[in-house]
Each structure stands twice: as structure tokens, then as C-alpha cells.
A protein has these predicted regions:
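An N-terminal, well-structured beta->alpha segment
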Residues: 1, 5-50
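Glycine-rich phosphate-binding loops that contact phosphosugars or nucleotide phosphates
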Residues: 46, 50-149
């Protein structure tokens, strides 16, 4: 190997190790945030007689799609509902016995907030997961889980 190749290889390894350290730190921070709200949310999911509906916009939507797919593949009936479609007629997929998980970094996404009155009318349990526990989404959901990573 040439010196340039060795330096490049070392840079790649250093970058990968640095990335993994950042992710480990994030997971440790997330672990420290787990509280009774998380326990309650898990209890709701375990007791759910309907399906788990997951919603989110943008990057939160991508995470929501993955969460819903993982739940479905492990035996929990689940679907992803795009919030924009939800406020324009697709809320018919949500029933009283469902649990709806609302993912939003800021907790202020307009489309997400527009869903809440209808979800309350349906009578389903809502769990918001946001970075901001004082956000409108956090305050208006049945339960909030803070996720500050």
C-alpha cells in the first residue's frame, strides 16, 4: 500500500468510528430520557385492540414508515398515514380502538396539528413523540414522549 492509500484507509476508519461514537452517545442520551410516559405508551400498544397508525411529515414521515413496517412485520397490525392525506379524507382508516403515533421533531408541523381534533373526535389514543415537550403537538396528544437527541 502507498502512503496515500494508508492515509485514506485510516481516514475512512476514523470517520466510521467517529460516526459510531456519535450514534452511541445519542443512544445513551435517549436511554436516559425513558420514563413512565414511555412505559404507558408501550402498555397502550400491547393492549391495542385495533391497529397502530403512525404519522409524520418529512424525515419524521420516513421514520414513521419504517416504524409501521417494523410493527407489521413483527405481528402488530400497523399502517402509515400521511398527515396531508389524513386531513383530506383518509382519516377513515382510523378507528376508536387504534393507537395513533404522531412523530414530529418540532411538534409544530401544521398538518400534524390539523389531525388532532379529528383524532380526538374518533376517540383513539394519541402518542406524540417530539423533541419539544412544550410544543402544541406534545400538549394536545393523549400522551407525549420526549425525544431530545
Amino acid at each position: 500500500m502507498t502512503n496515500n492509500k494508508i492515509e485514506t484507509s485510516q481516514n475512512i476508519l476514523n470517520s466510521a468510528r467517529g460516526f459510531l461514537r456519535i450514534e452511541q452517545d445519542g443512544l445513551r442520551a435517549l436511554e436516559a430520557q425513558l420514563d413512565e410516559h414511555f412505559v404507558t405508551a408501550v402498555e397502550w400498544l400491547l393492549a391495542c385492540r385495533g391497529k397502530v397508525v403512525v404519522t409524520g411529515m418529512g424525515k419524521s414521515g420516513h421514520i414513521g414508515r419504517k416504524l409501521s413496517a417494523t410493527l407489521s412485520s413483527t405481528g402488530t397490525p400497523s399502517l402509515f398515514l400521511h398527515p396531508g392525506e389524513g386531513v383530506h379524507g383518509d382519516l377513515g382508516v382510523v378507528a376508536r380502538q387504534d393507537v395513533v403515533i404522531l412523530l414530529s421533531n418540532s411538534g409544530t408541523t401544521e398538518e400534524m396539528l390539523q389531525l388532532l381534533p379529528s383524532l380526538r373526535s374518533i376517540g383513539c389514543q394519541t402518542v406524540s413523540i417530539t423533541r419539544n415537550p412544550s410544543s402544541p403537538l406534545a400538549m394536545q396528544a393523549s400522551l407525549h414522549i420526549s425525544c431530545q437527541v
